Amino acid sequence: MNKTKGFTKYKKMRYMPGLDGLRAIAVLGIIIYHLNKQWLTGGFLGVDTFFVISGYLITSLLLKEYDDTGIIKLKSFWIRRLKRLLPAVIVLLMVVGTATLLLKSDNIIRVKHDIIAAIFYVSNWWYIAKDVNYFEQFSFMPLKHLWSLAIEEQFYIFFPVILVTLLLTIKKRYKIGFIFWGVSIISLGLMMFIYSINGDHSRVYFGTDTRLQTLLLGVILAFLWPPFKLKNDPPKVVKYVIDSIGSLSFIVLILLFFIINDETNWIYDGGFYLISILTLFIIASVVHPSTWIAKIFSNPVLVFIGKRSYSLYLWHFAVISFVHSYYVDGQIPVYVYFIDISLTIIFAELSYRFIETPFRKEGIKALNWRPSYIPQFIRMAIVVTLLIPFMLILVGAFNKYGKDIIGEKANSFDTTIEDNYLMRIAPIDNIHIDGLVSEKKKESSDVYNNIKPLLIGDSVMVDIGESFKSSVPKSRIDGKVGRQLYQTLPLVKANYSQYKKSSDQVVLELGTNGDFTVKQLDDLLNQFGKAKIYLVNTRVPRIYEANVNRLLADAAKRKSNVTLIDWNKRSQGHSEYFAPDGVHLEYKGVLALKDEILKALKKK
């Protein structure tokens, strides 16, 4: 072994299959969450697991190089990262761009902008600027998941420079560790502060500044627990402690995958930090060369999946976005999920075998025009074929096919885009939906000319407002996009306190945008005194749907002046009622919900 100035040549760090096993758990959680978030409500925590692993592994590699050689070759590091990450992303972007042009051309402008952001690894800031909500998935945004890769790449660019600077200026490594810990606390504080001001999940979820805390915890672990310095034969007591802490942390993390959801507010008030600490304990145990938990995570099946975790992450969301765009959210047939999984596996395996691995080993030599090099030639031909439409998309050649909707609130329930689309109520003669008479005949009837109901609701009420007013001219309708039940009490006190008599009729359609408590519901109902109240329950593909409908049904049973309008039951199996989000209404849905309300009012 050649020695120069007290240092040896750099030796590769030992392979740690347990980390691949942990990657497998993380990516499976993410995929299940994106398939149907009600199956694994906290599956998105898998992203944080990846962040901690990245911080730990990258720092360990850099420290190992510095200890062996006395320097860190930044250029070589960045080239290795690009060879590892960029080719697979570029191929994904080319495929998604071409597929969007062929299958979803009206979205080509939005996807084009997302592609540009992804190329420069700024997707997270792009989505923040466009006020995109990560947790609402019914809008067609097949590249939205690349926000996390953007954060990691930004970290890979700046962190090595900072680390080298600190290593050269500060001799005591524990001091460097304290600096990174301090910055992680600042990042945590930023998340808590920004969230406390505006309650915006997406700003703190997407932000590099607010998510840096998780990556830096991995960095700190690399200083405390460098894998290249762990002993193969520690005392049995030490192994027992490591295994016990790692196992307990893993059990708690899996429980959190099932318990936490995107409405869990405490995760933004230190929760991500604490969950990442659990991940630290798991990593510490699976990278140790002699623990039994490391052997469990080194299971060949988990390692196989873990090695492909990057490809699986890249392709799963794009596949799900395309496939699910042809169905109503919340009413997706079971067989569709098998299609999702099958296509994800196929694309991920192709990417891993023919893109990731060759480019990681050979770099640009993985492409070759000479037919004698068959794999390289085929790869080159495919890339060039995809590159032509891809470049045309980027320069805007196909913009004429798209709608200029980039994403402002485009995938949030608090949106006017969907509602403006849904309110295109065209006169249709002789339409019949499950026994409904035509709109024209109903409007010509004077049955409802003399009733004066008050209707209060959210964006679904906005959807039916115009049609309902045409049938009940004296109705008073107050619908607002994004409204929640707890926000309605002050509104009622200020504007509708006169609706208290037994002859008054009040329709409340609330619960689309969030849950509420029994007390909040009762306080609202009590404001209407003896008035006849009609509660419209919800159909919304969110985890709170069942609880909202249960509370509304219970209120109807408890209070003699309250009637339940069971929109959930009425709309079951009627995908034609809904826009792609599974919540807002198409014209047939407008007529159906209006009919349910009118029938209830007529009975009383």
From Swiss-Prot:
Location in or out of the cell: Cell membrane
Pfam families in the record: Acyl_transf_3 (PF01757)
Membrane topology: Multi-pass membrane protein
A single MF term (Gene Ontology): acyltransferase activity, transferring groups other than amino-acyl groups
Alphabetic keyword roster: Acyltransferase, Cell membrane, Membrane, Transferase, Transmembrane, Transmembrane helix
Residues at the catalytic site: 459, 581, 584
GO terms (BP aspect): lipopolysaccharide biosynthetic process
Transmembrane segments: 15-35, 43-63, 85-105, 150-170, 176-196, 212-232, 240-260, 267-287, 310-330, 332-352, 377-397
Enzyme Commission number, as recorded: 2.3.1.-
InterPro entries listed in its UniProt record: Acyl_transf_3_dom, Acyltransferase_3, SGNH_hydro_sf
Chief localization: membrane
Similarity remark: Belongs to the acyltransferase 3 family.
Full protein name: Putative O-acetyltransferase SAS0844
Species in which this protein is naturally found: Staphylococcus aureus (strain MSSA476)
Lineage: Bacteria, Bacillati, Bacillota, Bacilli, Bacillales
